[in-house]
Design a protein with these regions (language model features):
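N-terminal strand-loop element at the rim of the active site
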Residues: 7-70, 149-153, 158, 237
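Short His-centered aromatic/hydrophobic patch
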Residues: 88-94, 112
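A short, active-site helix/loop in glycosyltransferases that binds the activated sugar's phosphate group
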Residues: 139-164, 172-176
Length: 373
């Protein structure tokens, strides 16, 4: 038997881009050949050495008439490469690829990377997203869920039968981090004093990641810890409001927003407490990244996050939109050294045991080989 050829279709960049690169890095190249069909948001040089072929077509996040053209182009590429498996990533590419693959003689797998119907949106949109997933579900053989919570959501919404769902927990590239360069970013680079207590978050400055809760929490922490500083690693459409809140409340000099960066872990290394206060979350990849860096975690008790974080074990959980609870959790990390050390130790153990990128690739390989038997 020759190599198994997988054709990946992906529209959304960001976290999905990072996931695919990590997945491809640890695939057995003696057994698998990978083709990437992606949107204009991807960079070909990022995939040097990871894929055998790179194809770029126009795919847009919004639903529209251009989707018909995207479907046609994906179908042409499926015919051109004749893969054993089409692997569709995220909801938009998932719909496009599954429709494009109808009637073709290969296997099809879909990974939503977080269900669109779990987003905080209008009931009308939620119903539309749910309907699209139900309609498209018969056109693939397996749906990969990145957490148990994602699988449960699919069952509750009756997207498909349980035997179509396969949980493959997300992971992080521990080897690359541990063998990489550390200390590239210094506190002084951000005008943060060396003795500052630094609280940080990594994520888009948008509704999902709750930067408004983070900055309100920051105000409460600053009132108790005068040398506290706060870092947001990311960019997004709420940045102006976040900066204005800090300015209006007198701590603008203590809030540092990096914008989009190539290496967020360089900034995570500065954190004394690491937050993910999301309003919804399919997995929360930054959580094992925090663990990998040895950071105590404060996270929201929502969706997949409790699958990763056990309150008082490898992190502290607070309710969604609970500004006071988040500030109290951060203050506990500041004040209780034994608790902080315990959270760090348990997190470090968990990330090595449960969230290693090699395991993610190996579980995919096993699934694909089983499908082709």
């Amino acid at each position: 038997m020759g190599k198994i050829r997988i054709l990946h279709v992906v529209q959304a960049a960001g976290g999905v881009d990072r996931y695919i690169r990590m997945l491809l890095k640890y695939f057995d190249k003696d057994k698998f050949e990978n083709v990437l069909v992606c949107s204009q948001d991807f960079q070909e040089e990022d995939y040097d050495g990871l894929v055998n072929s790179f194809e770029q077509i126009e795919m847009n996040r919004a639903i529209g008439a251009k989707d018909i053209k995207s479907i046609g182009e994906v179908r042409k590429l499926i015919r051109k490469y004749n893969p054993d498996i089409v692997y569709a990533h995220s909801s938009k590419a998932g719909a496009i690829a599954r429709v494009a693959d109808i009637g073709l003689k290969n296997h099809c797998v879909y990974n939503p990377h977080g269900w669109a119907f779990n987003m905080r949106c209008s009931d009308k949109k939620r119903m539309m997203y749910t309907a699209i997933e139900k309609i498209a579900a018969p056109f693939c053989e397996k749906i990969i869920c990145i957490s148990d919570a994602e699988k449960q959501s699919a069952l509750e919404k009756r997207i498909c039968k349980e035997n179509k769902l396969q949980v493959i927990f997300n992971g992080v590239d521990i080897e690359a981090y541990e063998n990489g360069e550390h200390g590239k970013v210094k506190k002084a680079d951000l005008n943060i004093p060396e003795d500052a207590f630094v609280v940080g978050m990594v994520g888009r400055i948008s509704l999902q990641k709750a930067p408004d809760v983070f900055v309100k929490m920051a105000k409460l922490v600053k009132e108790k810890v005068s040398n506290a500083h706060f870092i947001i690693v990311g960019n997004g459409n709420q940045e102006t409001e976040i900066r204005k809140y800090a300015e209006d409340n007198g701590f603008a000099d203590s809030l540092h927003i990096t914008g989009w960066v190539d290496d967020p872990m360089s900034y995570v290394e500065l954190f004394d407490a690491a937050c993910l206060l999301s309003r919804w979350e399919g997995f929360g990849l930054v959580l094992p990244e925090y663990m990998m860096a040895g950071k105590p975690i404060v996270a929201s008790n929502v969706d997949a996050i409790p699958n990763l974080i056990k309150d008082g074990g490898n992190g502290l959980l607070v309710e969604v939109d609970d500004t006071v609870g988040a500030s109290e959790a951060v203050l506990r990390i500041h004040q209780e050294i034994e608790l902080r050390d315990k959270l760090i130790a348990h997190g470090y153990e968990d990330v090595h045991r449960r969230f290693n990128a090699r395991r993610v690739s190996e579980e995919h390989e096993a699934l694909f080989e089983e499908m082709l038997k």
